[in-house]
């Protein structure tokens, strides 16, 4: 009897040491502090809602999902530090980063640790091109790439402003220079040459010298490869100094903070962005949940939501959370997501991405006529 009781006691201790519901650790990483924190908030909110919905439906492969948030401040060095922390924390999946300059160095760390990465917002072509060339098959996006954005903006300028004098500006970041260079390629291929190609610092506060240079060159169109903070200051100071050139930016302008910082000067600013998922009727119930929580799911909120949900669906199909198996499942089918059907190529890019042109008016970005 003593042996039986002893065996029962050991079994009871073993059961007590095992969680009733094991946790799968995942993370979302982006700029939670600093001048791009508004975009970090989009990633955090999207990931949190996705995890809540996944767990409410029973989790992934019988396990609950535990989310942690990492702050890289869109700084490459901080991004690598955060990525290493995710490795130490035994995270199996990362929805992030936001800035391409963070996603690219972090992807090398995730590869070595066999952590699957899906970025909702990093558009630089080098992220997936270089990763694939190095044998990294566990990097994906739910967004498009700079070559598609550049072609979209370049095509728009060629169609509507072929005889204009164009200044192409960028903030020296992988993202900003990436979209600027891809737009330059599209314009040049279409027979149009830029009148100016200039770099600025994303921390600049006074753009007077640059504005004067554009005035002297009689610039009609500003193609801005950069983020919303500098973009808002540039357009505001341009209008204050009597410079009325049309600004055309990219997806990094897509936050209400752009209009708050730039005020009325942002009216008429154009930008590229994917079709807005928050306006899709099929997402009405999901959008309502965000709004009930007092948050407007603009920008890359639903792209992050989609990244987490697509990972969960692929892990379920693979019956595994191992990065290689989940990656194979992602490439094997089409996933119906909040941002539309997602089908992946061998590099981890979505097939047939779409960007539209939007115009800022009274604090909101609205579709332009097709």
Residues covered by each model-derived region:
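Beta-alpha junction/loop-to-helix N-cap segments that form part of ligand/metal-binding clefts
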Residues: 38-43, 57-129, 200-207, 232, ...
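Extracytoplasmic "Venus flytrap"
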Residues: 27-46, 70-77, 98-101, 169-177, ...
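Segments of small-molecule ligand-sensing domains
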Residues: 290-301, 310-368
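Short beta-strand elements in bilobed, periplasmic/extracellular small-molecule ligand-binding domains
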Residues: 60-72, 135-138, 188-202, 272
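Extracytoplasmic ligand/sensor domains, especially the bilobed periplasmic-binding protein
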Residues: 88-196, 246-268
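Extracellular/periplasmic periplasmic-binding protein-like sensory domains
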Residues: 235-305, 364-368
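Sec/Tat signal peptide C-region and signal peptidase I cleavage site
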Residues: 18-22
């Amino acid at each position: 009897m003593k042996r039986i009781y002893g065996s029962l006691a050991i079994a009871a201790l073993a059961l007590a040491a095992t969680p009733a519901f094991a946790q799968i650790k995942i993370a979302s990483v982006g700029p939670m502090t600093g001048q791009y924190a508004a975009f970090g908030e989009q990633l955090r909110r999207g990931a949190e809602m996705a995890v809540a919905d996944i767990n409410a439906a029973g989790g992934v492969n019988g396990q609950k999902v535990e989310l942690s948030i990492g702050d890289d401040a869109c700084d490459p060095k901080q991004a690598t530090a955060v990525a290493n922390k995710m490795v130490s924390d035994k995270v199996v999946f990362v929805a992030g980063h936001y800035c391409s300059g963070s996603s690219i160095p972090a992807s090398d760390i995730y590869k070595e640790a066999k952590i699957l990465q899906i970025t909702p917002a990093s558009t630089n072509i080098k992220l997936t091109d270089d990763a694939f060339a190095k044998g990294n098959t566990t990097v994906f996006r739910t967004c498009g790439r700079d070559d598609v954005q550049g072609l979209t903006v370049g095509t728009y300028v060629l169609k509507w402003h072929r005889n204009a004098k164009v200044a192409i500006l960028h903030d020296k970041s992988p993202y900003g220079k990436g979209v600027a260079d891809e737009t330059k390629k599209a314009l040049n291929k279409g027979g149009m040459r830029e009148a100016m190609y200039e770099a600025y610092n994303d921390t600049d506060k006074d753009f007077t010298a640059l504005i004067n240079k554009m005035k002297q060159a009689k610039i009609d169109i500003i193609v801005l490869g950069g983020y919303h903070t500098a973009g808002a200051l540039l357009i505001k100071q341009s209008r204050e100094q009597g410079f009325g050139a049309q600004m055309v930016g990219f997806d990094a302008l897509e936050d209400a903070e752009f209009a708050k910082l730039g005020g009325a000067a942002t009216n008429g600013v154009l930008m590229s962005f994917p079709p807005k998922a928050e306006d899709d009727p099929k997402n009405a119930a999901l959008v309502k949940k965000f709004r009930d929580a007092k948050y407007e799911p603009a920008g890359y909120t639903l792209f992050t939501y989609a990244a987490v949900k697509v990972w969960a669906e692929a892990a379920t199909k693979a019956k595994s959370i191992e990065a290689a198996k989940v990656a194979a499942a992602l490439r094997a089918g089409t996933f119906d997501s909040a941002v539309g059907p997602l089908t992946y190529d061998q590099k981890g890019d979505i097939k047939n991405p779409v960007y539209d042109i939007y115009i800022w008016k009274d604090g909101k970005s609205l579709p332009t006529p097709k």
